[in-house]
A protein has these predicted regions:
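Domain-level signature for soluble enzymes in the chorismate/prephenate branch of the shikimate pathway
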Residues: 1-193
Length: 193
């Protein structure tokens, strides 16, 4: 999402293992810009991130919609028949359910992140493991892409919010499509009825 939103700009991405860690990093460094998944066609609203955003002092400065496409990637010279585990984020595993059903030899192993799964396989030289991740992550970590487009729903999108500290939020030029959007948070008393 960051590469798509800031297309053509020279950016440095900083990896955070969890969304709470992302919000913590943003609260410690006002010069950072965050990209936070907020909803997905299949998984729905990511309520944890709504709450993290509400509790932060960050401002929404833009959004990016991204079609989710997964690949099956493994170490070079590995074939799909040699694989025993498919490592990925639980939602990505869910998004590739039909593919995984066609390959019952692949034990699903939940990890914290799709790209992190690819990184772990590459760095630890994990034979027999495959990552379900994006094509960019597979290429970045030198994995061989065995199959592309393994996601069940080809119309699966995730909407990301671009968030920043108010100190720098005004410096970020909003995209045309973001100019007419508002986000409102309100609470109601929790009573019967």
């Amino acid at each position: 999402a960051a590469r798509e939103y800031f297309k053509g700009e020279d950016i440095e991405t900083v990896e955070c293992d969890t969304f709470p860690l992302l919000f913590e990093a943003l609260s410690c460094d006002a010069s950072m810009i965050g990209i936070v998944a907020i909803e997905n066609t299949i998984a729905g609203s990511l309520l944890q991130n709504h709450e993290l955003l509400r509790l932060s002092n960050l401002q929404i400065v833009g959004e990016q919609k991204l079609r989710i496409s997964h690949v099956l990637a493994a170490l070079p010279d590995q074939t799909i028949d040699q694989l025993t585990e498919a490592d990925s984020h639980p939602i990505a595993l869910m998004q590739c359910e039909q593919f995984l059903r066609r390959h019952p030899n692949l034990k699903m192993t939940e990890k914290f992140d799709t790209a992190g799964s690819a990184k772990e396989i590459a760095e630890q030289n994990l034979l027999g493991h495959a990552a379900i991740c994006g094509e960019y992550a597979a290429t970045l970590y030198g994995l061989n892409i065995l199959e592309k487009g393994i996601e069940t729903n080809k119309r699966n999108f995730t909407r990301f919010l671009i968030v920043a500290d108010p100190v720098i939020a005004h410096e970020l030029k909003p995209r045309e499509e973001s100019l007419n959007k508002s986000s409102i948070v309100f609470t109601l008393p929790h009573t019967q009825g």
